[in-house]
Amino acid sequence: MSGLNKKFTVIGAVALIIMDILVLTGTVKASETSTFSSFMWNMVPAGLLLGTTVLCVNFDVSAKKVAGVISVIVFGFMAAFRALAFGVFIYDRITLENPVAMTYSDYTKTAELVGYMLLMVAAIFFIMFLLKGAFRKTTTIISGISFAIIVGAWVVNLYNLINDAIFYDAAFSEILSAFISDGLVWSLVMVIAYLSTFASNLGLLKGAEKKD
């Protein structure tokens, strides 16, 4: 693993530790979910993505195969879970007895579900790349799209929060409280963790491209 990849991996690991502390202490949790659910559905896949990268780069073939099989199963389940959550959310919106217009929050929640679902799919392709040397371009493209969606949703949420704060002339403490309660801190740590890990993985993908 190159020096740059190691730096990005460390950044991702630190972000994951911060996320773990926030989740387990109940300081921050994904909206409308318990602390345990937040940990299971968000912390675990991020940790596995990071851990598998380290295993596949630094250990022998047998470790790669074990890590690869476990990760493909887990990330496949995660992608299916995100797809199910997305489907349930849309179904609920369509079948409401008194349908209401979609809000910015609804749109960003939908975007985040799609973004993380694509990210799980990208993770599967990345593991296959590490094991087989294939799917390099596919991994890069899907990962890039997923991050664009996730980061875009975060920016929109932040923009709406600032707009509301200006409109209601909110105090700084109220803005900070809203920033935390709206899940923006959680989302930011998630983005840093995933993005730094992806940057490390992208270095591996580019390294493979030079060897082709």
Where are these regions (language model features)?
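Transmembrane alpha-helical segments of multi-pass membrane proteins
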Residues: 10-14, 65-83, 140-154
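Membrane-proximal helix-loop-helix units in multi-pass membrane proteins
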Residues: 80-139
